[in-house]
UniProtKB/Swiss-Prot annotation:
Class of this enzyme: hydrolase
GO molecular function, one term: metal ion binding
CDD domains: CBM36_xylanase-like, CBM6_xylanase-like, GH43_XynD-like
Species annotation: Paenibacillus polymyxa (Bacillus polymyxa)
Temperature dependence as stated in the record: Optimum temperature is 55 degrees Celsius.
GO cellular component, one term: extracellular region
Site description Important for catalytic activity, responsible for pKa modulation of the active site Glu and correct orientation of both the proton donor and substrate, residues in chain: 188
PROSITE patterns with a match to the protein in the record: CBM6
Name of the protein in question: Arabinoxylan arabinofuranohydrolase
Pfam families referenced in this protein's UniProt entry, alphabetically: CBM_6, Glyco_hydro_43
Principal localisation: secreted
Gene: xynD
Reaction equations catalysed: Hydrolysis of terminal non-reducing alpha-L-arabinofuranoside residues in alpha-L-arabinosides
UniProt-annotated binding residues for Ca(2+) 1: 382, 384, 406-407, 503
Record's subcellular location: Secreted
Length: 635
């Protein structure tokens, strides 16, 4: 997973030359992901050793937490991998617009992650692998990670983005695990859940003796071991995978009933032509435990495509009936400092299986994958959903109404911008644009089409909200936004500091009616002793006892609304859910029976401004549970 890359020392003056002073009359330029391209997947942060998880129409990419490390003079060091104690997560439905889900603070030994580390025994979290499996009818997610080269740990969650817990309190696999002796580097996990629900964990790497040609040619340090039904235990002994010229980076996928084990070929010694150094080779078997037979290679070293090399790390996945490979390359760091220095970023390109089962050579490039579907601008869009950007970063937020591990866009200066690809405004077009913002000084958000200097269709004045985590929804009118366009939000304002933070945004359609605001229960704050997420009869939240609730903050310009909630009871009884706005109970929803229904409370009056909306139990008699799907109303 970790190899040294080209060392290039930069002076502080040169570093500053890469970041010229902003011309306040012009928008900033993107760093590495250029509008129209899909690679790298993001350039506002780094991410290495990518692994994919496809779930519920989204692809999630989990990555090691590459972070710039600095010399005393302010120049960027060569990556020493000391910051790999967290896991980065992003996701997308269309392969262009990626939502930043922040970091998972995995390693917890020696007060790592400021004491928030989940695995208190682990000092590192390298090269994640992720799997989904239904256990006892419930969706469960499993995050495997390497504690350096000493073993593999596992975390579990009920959603792909957490919250994550450590079910074991120790490593799942170590050198003491049967069959794991002799593995030089016990890291770089990959995981397969087969069609029958059985899980398999692949790992390993390294050359036992780099001065021995036989050891270089057949390191025999890759392993596969069967997982227990709970995915957090192992069964039996690990089996050796005799991958020729193995270096690291286990990968696994299944295609047409065959099992494909793939890996990074090592750099040591002299290789026969069929084992090119630093490329991704692959083997095929009829059994997930092997034996595997070497068939060839399909992904060249990143240097071939981008002029900056280093190790090769990949994962193969199928998304919406097409095959892809995600891999890392040092393209963002090259764009920022002129050299990779070992700092990596995720890329995706298409992968093709030929009729005979062999894999075609993948063409790595900055173009990437064309957007798979248009975006709907009339639903809430998290601001950290970004196709392209200039100047911004993201941070954890206190704003409500977003997903678990919600972020906001920050570090916003005059001329910075964010953009999303291919939003479909329809023939009627947009009427208004609203955004959830927080700011001390205020500023403006220009809404432009197709470029940062494209047609201006609206301008949103952002007043001071009284704090950078004091949130308020503001709105403006939109003109001449119809059809399919890329949307650019360009930030303007005075001063040299952070102008504002942006949590989410949404357009309203120009149909003559009011916009519909819909908030999913599973994205709200969950409170009470027993409340928890459910996946049946819908993805939502179960309220099991009095004082259980879900809530979020909503800005109201008007004081009267019709408010609808979709819900159900756990049985034939009637589940009563109170609607509380601003601390005042304004009505109740009564859901009878297990079939979900939408109920509406009409002409509800309440206070204006920022108000807490809460759906709560106060009259539970112990004979029923309430299931809540979403709340919906017209602004």
């Amino acid at each position: 997973m970790i190899r040294k890359c080209l060392v290039l020392f930069l002076s502080f003056a040169l570093l500053l030359s890469v970041f010229p002073m902003l011309n306040v009359d012009a928008a900033n330029r993107p760093l590495a992901k250029i509008p129209g391209n899909s690679n790298p997947l993001m350039d506002h942060k780094l991410g290495a050793d990518p692994y994919s998880l496809v779930y519920d129409g989204r692809v999630y990419i989990f990555m090691s937490s590459d972070t710039y490390v600095y010399n005393k003079d302010g120049s960027i060091k060569e990556n020493d991998f000391s910051a790999l104690d967290r896991i980065q997560v992003i996701s997308s439905t269309d392969m262009v617009n990626w939502t930043d889900h922040g970091t998972i603070p995995v390693a917890g030994a020696n007060n790592k992650n400021s004491g928030r580390g989940i695995a208190k025994w682990a000092s590192n979290s390298w090269a994640p692998a992720v799997a989904h499996k239904k256990i006892n009818g419930r969706d469960k997610f499993f995050l495997y990670f390497a504690n350096g080269g000493a073993g593999i740990g596992v975390l579990t969650a009920d959603t792909p983005i957490g919250p994550w817990t450590d079910p074991l309190g120790k490593a799942l696999v170590t050198h003491s695990t049967p069959g794991m002796a002799g593995v030089t580097w016990l890291f770089d996990p990959a995981v397969l859940v087969d069609d029958d629900g059985t899980g398999y964990l692949y790992s390993g790497g390294g050359i036992p003796n780099e001065s021995d040609p036989a050891s270089i040619a057949n390191p025999k340090t890759a392993r596969v071991i069967k997982l227990g039904a709970d995915m957090t235990s192992v069964i039996g002994s690990a089996t050796t995978i005799d991958a020729p010229y193995l270096f690291e980076d286990s990968g696994i996928h299944k295609y047409n009933g065959k099992y494909y084990y793939s890996y990074c070929i090592n750099f040591a010694g002299t290789h026969p032509q069929q084992y090119p150094a630093g490329e991704i080779g692959y083997m095929v078997s009829d059994n997930p435990m092997g034996p595997f037979t070497y068939k060839g290679h399909f992904l060249k070293n990143p240097y071939t495509f981008f002029g900056v090399g280093g190790n090769n790390h990949h994962a193969v996945f199928n998304f919406k009936n097409e095959w892809y490979v995600v891999y890392h390359a040092q393209t963002v760091s090259k764009a920022q400092i002129g050299a990779g220095k070992g700092y990596r970023s995720p890329h995706i390109n298409k992968l093709v299986h030929k009729e005979d089962g062999s894999i075609s050579e993948v063409q790595g490039n900055m173009t990437g994958i064309a957007q798979l579907s248009n975006m709907n601008p009339y639903t809430r869009v998290e601001a950290e959903t970004i196709a392209w950007q200039a100047g911004v970063t993201t941070e954890p937020t206190q704003a409500s109404g977003g997903p678990i591990s919600n972020l906001n866009v920050t570090n916003i200066h005059n001329g910075d911008w964010i953009a999303v690809g291919k939003a479909d405004f329809g023939s009627a077009g947009a009427k208004t644009f609203k955004a959830n913002v927080a700011t001390n000084v205020g500023g403006n958000i220009e809404v432009r089409l197709d470029s940062e200097t494209g047609p201006l269709v609206g301008s949103l004045k952002v007043p001071s909200t009284g704090g950078m985590q004091t949130w308020r929804e503001v709105e403006t009118t939109i003109n001449n936004a119809t059809g399919v366009h890329n949307i650019y939000l360009v930030f303007t304002g005075s001063g040299s500091g952070n102008l504002l933070n942006l949590d989410a945004w949404q357009f309203t359609p120009n149909t003559g009616g009011n916009t519909i605001t819909k908030v999913e229960a599973e994205n709200m704050k969950i409170g009470g002793t027993y409340a928890g997420k459910i996946s049946a009869p819908f993805d939502g939240v179960a309220l099991y006892a009095n004082a259980d609730y879900v809530s979020y903050s909503q800005y109201f310009a008007n004081s009267t609304h019709n408010i609808s909630v979709r819900g159900a009871s756990s049985n034939a009884g009637t589940a009563k859910v109170d609607l509380v706005i601003g601390g005042v109970t304004v009505g109740s929803f009564n859901f009878t029976g297990k079939t979900p229904t939408v109920q509406t409370l009409s002409n509800i009056t309440h206070a204006t401004g920022d108000q807490e909306i809460k759906l709560a139990l106060t009259s539970d008699d112990g004979t029923w549970d309430a299931y809540v799907d979403f709340i919906e109303f017209s602004l």
